[in-house]
Protein backbone atom coordinates (compact mmCIF):
# COMPACT_ATOMS: atom_id res chain seq x y z
CA UNK A 1 0.00 0.00 0.00
CA UNK A 2 1.33 3.42 -1.01
CA UNK A 3 -0.87 5.24 1.54
CA UNK A 4 -2.01 7.95 -0.86
CA UNK A 5 -5.01 8.56 1.39
CA UNK A 6 -2.64 9.29 4.25
CA UNK A 7 -0.58 11.59 2.03
CA UNK A 8 -3.70 13.47 0.97
CA UNK A 9 -4.75 13.91 4.61
CA UNK A 10 -1.26 15.13 5.52
CA UNK A 11 -1.25 17.60 2.63
CA UNK A 12 -4.57 19.04 3.75
CA UNK A 13 -3.48 19.21 7.38
CA UNK A 14 -0.25 20.98 6.40
CA UNK A 15 -1.90 23.54 4.13
CA UNK A 16 -0.84 21.87 0.88
CA UNK A 17 -4.34 21.05 -0.40
CA UNK A 18 -4.40 21.48 -4.17
CA UNK A 19 -6.49 18.59 -5.48
CA UNK A 20 -8.78 15.77 -4.39
CA UNK A 21 -8.57 11.99 -4.52
CA UNK A 22 -9.94 10.29 -7.64
CA UNK A 23 -11.77 7.00 -7.02
CA UNK A 24 -13.34 4.37 -9.25
CA UNK A 25 -14.44 0.75 -9.12
CA UNK A 26 -14.76 -2.13 -11.55
CA UNK A 27 -18.45 -1.20 -12.04
CA UNK A 28 -18.32 2.60 -11.87
CA UNK A 29 -16.57 5.52 -13.52
CA UNK A 30 -14.21 7.97 -11.87
CA UNK A 31 -15.53 10.02 -8.97
CA UNK A 32 -14.03 12.67 -6.71
CA UNK A 33 -13.43 12.15 -2.98
CA UNK A 34 -13.11 15.72 -1.62
CA UNK A 35 -10.39 15.78 1.02
CA UNK A 36 -12.11 18.51 3.10
CA UNK A 37 -15.02 16.07 3.55
CA UNK A 38 -12.67 13.75 5.44
CA UNK A 39 -12.20 16.55 7.99
CA UNK A 40 -15.94 17.20 8.43
CA UNK A 41 -17.48 18.15 11.75
CA UNK A 42 -20.54 16.54 13.31
CA UNK A 43 -23.01 18.96 11.69
CA UNK A 44 -21.72 18.00 8.22
CA UNK A 45 -21.80 14.23 8.76
CA UNK A 46 -24.48 12.01 7.17
CA UNK A 47 -27.44 11.26 9.44
CA UNK A 48 -26.36 7.63 9.84
CA UNK A 49 -22.97 8.70 11.20
CA UNK A 50 -24.62 11.20 13.54
CA UNK A 51 -26.97 8.48 14.79
CA UNK A 52 -24.08 6.09 15.39
CA UNK A 53 -22.14 8.68 17.40
CA UNK A 54 -25.22 9.37 19.52
CA UNK A 55 -25.52 5.64 20.33
CA UNK A 56 -21.91 5.32 21.52
CA UNK A 57 -21.34 4.25 25.12
CA UNK A 58 -18.38 3.32 27.31
CA UNK A 59 -14.87 2.63 26.04
CA UNK A 60 -14.78 2.99 22.24
CA UNK A 61 -12.72 1.55 19.38
CA UNK A 62 -12.88 3.69 16.23
CA UNK A 63 -11.86 1.40 13.35
CA UNK A 64 -10.54 3.05 10.20
CA UNK A 65 -10.48 6.40 11.97
CA UNK A 66 -9.08 8.38 9.03
CA UNK A 67 -8.47 12.01 9.97
CA UNK A 68 -10.09 11.40 13.36
CA UNK A 69 -13.34 13.33 13.03
CA UNK A 70 -15.48 10.76 14.84
CA UNK A 71 -12.88 10.24 17.56
CA UNK A 72 -12.49 13.97 18.20
CA UNK A 73 -16.25 14.45 18.48
CA UNK A 74 -16.46 11.66 21.06
CA UNK A 75 -13.37 12.85 22.94
CA UNK A 76 -14.97 16.26 23.29
CA UNK A 77 -17.92 14.51 24.93
CA UNK A 78 -15.57 13.03 27.53
CA UNK A 79 -15.55 9.55 25.98
CA UNK A 80 -12.34 7.49 25.93
CA UNK A 81 -11.59 6.38 22.37
CA UNK A 82 -8.90 4.17 20.86
CA UNK A 83 -8.49 5.11 17.20
CA UNK A 84 -6.88 2.78 14.67
CA UNK A 85 -6.12 2.93 10.96
CA UNK A 86 -3.73 1.06 8.67
CA UNK A 87 -2.69 4.42 7.18
CA UNK A 88 0.40 5.92 8.81
CA UNK A 89 -0.45 9.29 7.32
CA UNK A 90 -3.94 9.21 8.82
CA UNK A 91 -2.60 8.41 12.29
CA UNK A 92 -0.04 11.20 11.99
CA UNK A 93 -2.88 13.61 11.20
CA UNK A 94 -4.91 12.25 14.14
CA UNK A 95 -2.00 12.89 16.48
CA UNK A 96 -1.57 16.42 15.18
CA UNK A 97 -5.29 17.12 15.59
CA UNK A 98 -5.25 15.97 19.21
CA UNK A 99 -6.67 12.45 19.04
CA UNK A 100 -5.46 10.97 22.32
CA UNK A 101 -5.05 7.26 21.58
CA UNK A 102 -4.36 6.80 17.86
CA UNK A 103 -2.19 4.04 16.46
CA UNK A 104 -1.38 2.30 13.19
CA UNK A 105 -3.07 -1.09 13.43
CA UNK A 106 -5.36 -3.54 11.67
CA UNK A 107 -8.54 -4.56 13.44
CA UNK A 108 -7.27 -8.15 13.37
CA UNK A 109 -4.30 -7.09 15.54
CA UNK A 110 -6.50 -5.74 18.35
CA UNK A 111 -7.09 -7.93 21.42
CA UNK A 112 -8.49 -5.67 24.16
CA UNK A 113 -12.23 -5.36 24.72
CA UNK A 114 -14.56 -2.40 24.25
CA UNK A 115 -18.10 -1.29 24.99
CA UNK A 116 -18.58 0.17 21.51
CA UNK A 117 -16.79 -0.63 18.25
CA UNK A 118 -17.36 1.89 15.45
CA UNK A 119 -16.98 0.96 11.78
CA UNK A 120 -18.30 3.86 9.71
CA UNK A 121 -18.06 5.17 6.12
CA UNK A 122 -19.03 1.74 4.78
CA UNK A 123 -17.67 -0.19 7.73
CA UNK A 124 -18.08 -3.54 5.97
CA UNK A 125 -15.49 -2.43 3.41
CA UNK A 126 -12.57 -3.78 5.42
CA UNK A 127 -14.07 -7.29 5.29
CA UNK A 128 -12.99 -7.28 1.60
CA UNK A 129 -14.84 -10.40 0.47
CA UNK A 130 -18.07 -12.15 1.42
CA UNK A 131 -16.05 -15.25 2.32
CA UNK A 132 -14.11 -13.25 4.95
CA UNK A 133 -17.13 -11.74 6.72
CA UNK A 134 -17.55 -14.42 9.39
CA UNK A 135 -13.82 -14.29 10.18
CA UNK A 136 -13.99 -10.56 10.83
CA UNK A 137 -17.28 -10.78 12.72
CA UNK A 138 -15.94 -13.53 14.96
CA UNK A 139 -12.91 -11.41 15.78
CA UNK A 140 -15.03 -8.31 16.41
CA UNK A 141 -17.26 -10.39 18.69
CA UNK A 142 -14.20 -11.36 20.76
CA UNK A 143 -13.46 -7.65 21.31
CA UNK A 144 -16.85 -6.88 22.86
CA UNK A 145 -17.35 -6.48 26.57
CA UNK A 146 -20.61 -7.91 27.99
CA UNK A 147 -23.47 -5.63 26.85
CA UNK A 148 -21.12 -4.24 24.20
CA UNK A 149 -22.13 -3.16 20.70
CA UNK A 150 -20.74 -2.89 17.19
CA UNK A 151 -22.09 0.03 15.14
CA UNK A 152 -21.47 -0.52 11.44
CA UNK A 153 -22.84 0.98 8.24
CA UNK A 154 -22.99 -0.20 4.65
CA UNK A 155 -25.12 -0.08 1.51
CA UNK A 156 -26.98 -2.48 -0.73
CA UNK A 157 -25.46 -1.54 -4.09
CA UNK A 158 -27.73 -3.75 -6.21
CA UNK A 159 -29.07 -0.52 -7.73
CA UNK A 160 -25.69 -0.02 -9.44
CA UNK A 161 -26.42 -3.05 -11.61
CA UNK A 162 -29.78 -1.83 -12.91
CA UNK A 163 -30.16 -1.01 -16.58
CA UNK A 164 -32.34 1.78 -17.95
CA UNK A 165 -35.41 -0.45 -17.90
CA UNK A 166 -34.96 -1.37 -14.25
CA UNK A 167 -33.63 -4.86 -14.96
CA UNK A 168 -30.55 -6.26 -13.24
CA UNK A 169 -27.40 -7.35 -15.07
CA UNK A 170 -25.73 -9.16 -12.16
CA UNK A 171 -23.63 -12.13 -13.27
CA UNK A 172 -24.91 -14.99 -11.12
CA UNK A 173 -21.67 -16.90 -11.74
CA UNK A 174 -19.52 -14.06 -10.43
CA UNK A 175 -18.65 -13.21 -6.83
CA UNK A 176 -21.17 -11.50 -4.53
CA UNK A 177 -22.26 -8.27 -6.21
CA UNK A 178 -21.04 -6.12 -3.32
CA UNK A 179 -17.40 -7.20 -3.76
CA UNK A 180 -15.73 -4.40 -5.71
CA UNK A 181 -12.26 -3.66 -6.98
CA UNK A 182 -11.60 -0.16 -5.65
CA UNK A 183 -9.08 2.20 -7.22
CA UNK A 184 -7.68 5.48 -5.89
CA UNK A 185 -5.26 8.01 -7.29
CA UNK A 186 -3.90 11.28 -5.93
CA UNK A 187 -1.63 13.78 -7.65
CA UNK A 188 -0.93 11.26 -10.39
CA UNK A 189 0.00 8.41 -8.04
CA UNK A 190 -2.14 5.28 -8.20
CA UNK A 191 -2.84 3.31 -5.04
CA UNK A 192 -2.54 -0.47 -4.99
CA UNK A 193 -6.08 -1.67 -5.87
CA UNK A 194 -8.23 -2.70 -2.91
CA UNK A 195 -11.04 -5.20 -2.58
CA UNK A 196 -13.88 -3.35 -0.87
CA UNK A 197 -17.11 -4.94 0.33
CA UNK A 198 -20.56 -3.39 0.33
CA UNK A 199 -22.96 -5.67 2.20
CA UNK A 200 -26.75 -5.68 2.06
CA UNK A 201 -28.44 -5.86 5.47
CA UNK A 202 -29.92 -9.36 5.14
CA UNK A 203 -26.55 -10.85 4.19
CA UNK A 204 -24.92 -9.11 7.16
CA UNK A 205 -27.69 -10.33 9.46
CA UNK A 206 -27.30 -13.93 8.29
CA UNK A 207 -23.53 -13.78 8.80
CA UNK A 208 -24.09 -12.43 12.32
CA UNK A 209 -26.42 -15.31 13.13
CA UNK A 210 -23.69 -17.72 12.03
CA UNK A 211 -21.23 -16.33 14.60
CA UNK A 212 -23.72 -15.74 17.42
CA UNK A 213 -24.36 -12.02 17.11
CA UNK A 214 -27.68 -10.19 17.09
CA UNK A 215 -28.07 -7.76 14.20
CA UNK A 216 -30.52 -4.86 14.32
CA UNK A 217 -31.21 -2.39 11.52
CA UNK A 218 -31.09 0.84 13.53
CA UNK A 219 -31.72 3.32 10.74
CA UNK A 220 -31.86 3.45 6.97
CA UNK A 221 -30.34 6.23 4.93
CA UNK A 222 -31.58 7.98 1.81
CA UNK A 223 -29.74 5.85 -0.73
CA UNK A 224 -29.91 2.12 0.09
CA UNK A 225 -27.57 2.59 3.06
CA UNK A 226 -28.18 1.54 6.65
CA UNK A 227 -26.73 1.58 10.16
CA UNK A 228 -26.69 -1.74 12.02
CA UNK A 229 -26.11 -2.52 15.68
CA UNK A 230 -24.53 -5.89 16.48
CA UNK A 231 -24.68 -7.28 20.01
CA UNK A 232 -23.84 -10.50 21.81
CA UNK A 233 -26.50 -13.17 22.20
CA UNK A 234 -27.43 -13.26 25.87
Model-identified regions with their sequence ranges:
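Conserved SAM/SAH-binding loop
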Residues: 67
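A short SAM/SAH-binding and catalytic strip from SAM-dependent methyltransferases
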Residues: 114-134
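A short glycine-rich, Lys/Arg-flanked "PGG" loop and its adjoining helix->strand segment in the class I
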Residues: 134-146
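SAM-dependent methyltransferase
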Residues: 11, 146-206
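N-terminal auxiliary segments of SAM/dcSAM-dependent transferases
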Residues: 1-22
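Conserved SAM/SAH-binding beta-strand->alpha-helix loop
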Residues: 87-88
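Conserved alpha-helix/loop element of class I SAM-dependent methyltransferases that forms part
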Residues: 40-59
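Conserved SAM-binding strand-loop segment of SAM-dependent methyltransferases
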Residues: 98-108
Amino acid sequence: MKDILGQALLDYQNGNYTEDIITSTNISDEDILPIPYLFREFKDMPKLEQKALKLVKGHVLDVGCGAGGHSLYLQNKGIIVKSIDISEGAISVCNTRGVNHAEVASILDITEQFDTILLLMNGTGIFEKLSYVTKYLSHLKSLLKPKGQILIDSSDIQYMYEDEDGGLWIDTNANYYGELDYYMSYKGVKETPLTWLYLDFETLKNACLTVGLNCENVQEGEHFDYLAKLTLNE
